[in-house]
């Protein structure tokens, strides 16, 4: 009896601590595809969402009416704007989506091909195949003509779709896990399994800054004005850098043995960094101090075991709320206290 009482007390304390660390009272929620999504991107201001639903995903949710394919959603008006359907004739799973900085274009990718979409016109700009590696991450410039791909063969490929120019960045010695392209398409940041992240010129391929980690670099992000960069590895190290000088500004303060990010985005002014994790955690950080200011837990995928959801994307909207988009097919907004 005494042992049971001890375990009860420990369980109660654990729940209390979890309640202290997480604030789960979202102020708005959009349940767009409750059978789950394979990828889900937000626009920079969280006005729009673009997600892909795979037929048969989370089959336990048989009452869902959302169709398989690519969906473009207006979160402010809470309605679907465009149903794009399948990316290719094989109905391949779309695993990566990025919306351009100005919200006009998007790039979506399967393992072997990528498509560019004009979100304003609601049309496809084309489909391109990649044969020399598996696509692991993508980004697109604001004009919709320059794209960046991170591949499993260690290449980061910059392509100008208007001219056909292709630049292969070959500095990485192993898989490229994460890429980011500046809004004007002139600069790129890439991180890979070789423990390095590189900031480089897309016109010349010249390396401008080199950032080294002790473990594989799993997530990177560029601040839109070119002030800062985030590089995070597969352990618990995440650094914010001054892009002009290459100096380390700070390290994100975390007590976890392992802190992996599935998404990351700086606020427009660079004051904050928002991150999402594969376990459904959303966090707000102070860019200069590296201190965590807020933490939330995203709604898990229904009937999933264990109950969790991958945070595919994060953003800060015009109401200064943190917004997340997850594999549960749900977007949530939280107030910044």
Name every feature range the model reports, one short phrase each:
Residues 2-7, 14-337:
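WD40-repeat beta-propeller superdomains and closely related acidic/aromatic-rich repeat-like regions
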């Amino acid at each position: 009896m005494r042992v049971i009482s001890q375990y009860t007390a420990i369980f109660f304390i654990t729940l209390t601590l979890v309640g202290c660390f997480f604030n789960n009272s979202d102020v708005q929620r959009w349940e767009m595809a409750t059978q789950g999504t394979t990828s889900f991107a937000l626009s920079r201001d969280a006005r729009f969402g673009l997600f892909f639903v795979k037929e048969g995903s989370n089959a336990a949710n048989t009452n869902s009416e959302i169709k398989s394919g690519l969906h473009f959603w207006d979160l402010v008006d809470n309605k679907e704007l465009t149903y794009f359907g399948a990316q290719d004739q094989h109905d391949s799973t779309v695993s990566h989506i990025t919306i351009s900085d100005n919200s006009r274009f998007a790039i979506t990718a399967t393992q072997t091909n990528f498509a560019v979409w004009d979100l304003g016109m609601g049309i496809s700009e084309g489909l391109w195949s990649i044969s020399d590696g598996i696509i692991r991450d993508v980004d697109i410039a604001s004009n919709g003509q320059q794209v960046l791909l991170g591949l499993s063969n260690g290449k980061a490929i910059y392509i100008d779709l208007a001219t056909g120019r292709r630049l292969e960045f070959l500095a990485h010695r192993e898989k490229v896990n994460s890429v980011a392209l500046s809004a004007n398409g002139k600069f790129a940041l890439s991180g890979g399994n070789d423990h390095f992240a590189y900031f480089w010129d897309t016109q010349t391929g010249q390396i401008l800054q080199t950032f080294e980690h002790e473990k594989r670099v799993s997530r990177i992000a560029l601040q839109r004005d070119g002030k800062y960069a985030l590089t995070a590895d597969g352990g618990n190290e995440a650094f914010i850098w001054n892009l002009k000088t290459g100096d380390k500004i700070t390290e994100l303060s975390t007590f976890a043995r392992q802190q992996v990010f599935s998404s990351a985005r700086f606020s427009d002014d660079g004051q904050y960094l928002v991150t999402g994790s594969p376990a459904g955690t959303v966090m707000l950080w102070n860019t200069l101090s590296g201190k965590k200011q807020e933490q939330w837990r995203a709604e898990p995928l229904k009937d999933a075991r264990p109950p969790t959801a991958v945070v595919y994307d994060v953003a800060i909207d015009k109401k200064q709320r943190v917004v997340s988009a997850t594999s549960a097919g749900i977007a949530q907004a939280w107030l910044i206290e």
